[in-house]
């Protein structure tokens, strides 16, 4: 098994109801070993204010979002296991899970899987890329024991 190193940062006022560090590690271990032998990821849990500010600064979107991914780009000659940072807004994740009628734990897992794939270079801007990324997300989520996160969209 490959090494996954997690730096979990709690930067939100309310810690009650958040997944445990072991959950985040398990979700990362469901993704990263498929692509790398060793990876280090920071997961920062934030409130809506920080998510909103980061989303505005880096994406020009004037609202908080569920997950932001910040890949680490080392010079080509430097080999480091640092993959990057995931910033996850717990209020947005909780609200989305409720609105989409998804189990909260499954939605948290999906945000970690989705964000990790962004760190690995996957994107969903073009339709073809989106289909590839969603297919990978579904496969990884099912291996982790969760339902297809896009099932409701596919059935609509």
UniProtKB/Swiss-Prot annotation:
It is found in: Cytoplasm. Its EC number is 3.1.-.-. Keywords: Cytoplasm, Endonuclease, Hydrolase, Metal-binding, Nuclease, Ribosome biogenesis, rRNA processing, Zinc. InterPro entries: MetalPrtase_cat_dom_sf_prd, YbeY, YbeY_CS. The keyword rRNA processing applies. One of its GO terms (cellular component) is cytoplasm. One of its GO terms (biological process) is rRNA processing. Signal peptide: none annotated. Its main location: cytoplasm. Single strand-specific metallo-endoribonuclease involved in late-stage 70S ribosome quality control and in maturation of the 3' terminus of the 16S rRNA. PANTHER family: ENDORIBONUCLEASE YBEY, CHLOROPLASTIC. This is Endoribonuclease YbeY. The lineage of its organism: Bacteria, Pseudomonadati, Pseudomonadota, Gammaproteobacteria, Enterobacterales. The gene is ybeY.
